[in-house]
């Protein structure tokens, strides 16, 4: 996280938690000539709806406007949303939540000739994950060292 996103996370986390929400991620990006501050929030169980996001957006906007000195060098567009069904798995809390769920994993290097896997996360520890993948009509457990995981996210099984 950058200093701006860390500051935003520090501001948003208590606001979200006071409402029973969870801050999932903060992004501060420039696309074309416009800056965007994207804040992803969720609520368990059941998720967060658009009305709750709109209410939280107003609270967040007010708090960010009060920051002095202003941490944003340029005008930006504030976007609050849920992370969606295919939310990223970024931290240990996300990994624990993903246990038993269907996930997508991209790797830095190939394992068994593949750099991407989708399957059910059966187990994990600090060093590796165990993913149950379907190969044709059979299921197979694949152990993946965490240090070779480039990215991971929840996935929808078809």
Curated annotation (Swiss-Prot):
It is found in: Cytoplasm. Keywords: Cytoplasm, Ribosome biogenesis. CDD domains: YlxS_C (cd01734). One of its GO terms (biological process) is ribosomal small subunit assembly. InterPro entries: Ribosome_maturation_RimP (IPR003728), RimP_C (IPR028998), RimP_C_sf (IPR036847), RimP_N (IPR028989), RimP_N_sf (IPR035956). Its main location: cytoplasm. One of its GO terms (cellular component) is cytosol. Gene3D superfamilies: Ribosome maturation factor RimP, C-terminal domain, RimP-like superfamily, N-terminal. Belongs to the RimP family. Required for maturation of 30S ribosomal subunits. This is Ribosome maturation factor RimP. It comes from Lactobacillus johnsonii (strain CNCM I-12250 / La1 / NCC 533). The lineage of its organism: Bacteria, Bacillati, Bacillota, Bacilli, Lactobacillales. The gene is rimP.
């Amino acid at each position: 996280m950058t200093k701006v996103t860390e500051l935003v996370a520090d501001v948003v986390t208590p606001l979200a938690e006071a409402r029973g929400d969870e801050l999932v991620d903060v992004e501060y990006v420039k696309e074309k000539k416009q800056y965007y501050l994207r804040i992803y929030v969720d609520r368990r169980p059941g998720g967060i709806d658009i009305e709750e996001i709109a209410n939280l957006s107003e609270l967040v906007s007010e708090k960010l406007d009060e920051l002095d000195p202003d941490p944003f060098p340029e005008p930006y567009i504030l976007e609050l949303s849920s992370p969606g069904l295919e939310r990223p798995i970024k931290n240990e809390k996300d990994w624990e939540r993903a246990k038993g769920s269907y996930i997508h994993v991209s790797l830095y290097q190939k394992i068994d000739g593949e750099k991407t896997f989708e399957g059910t996360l059966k187990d994990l520890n600090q060093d590796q994950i165990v993913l149950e993948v379907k190969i044709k009509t059979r299921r197979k457990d694949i152990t993946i060292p965490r240090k070779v995981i480039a990215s991971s996210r929840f996935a929808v099984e078809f």
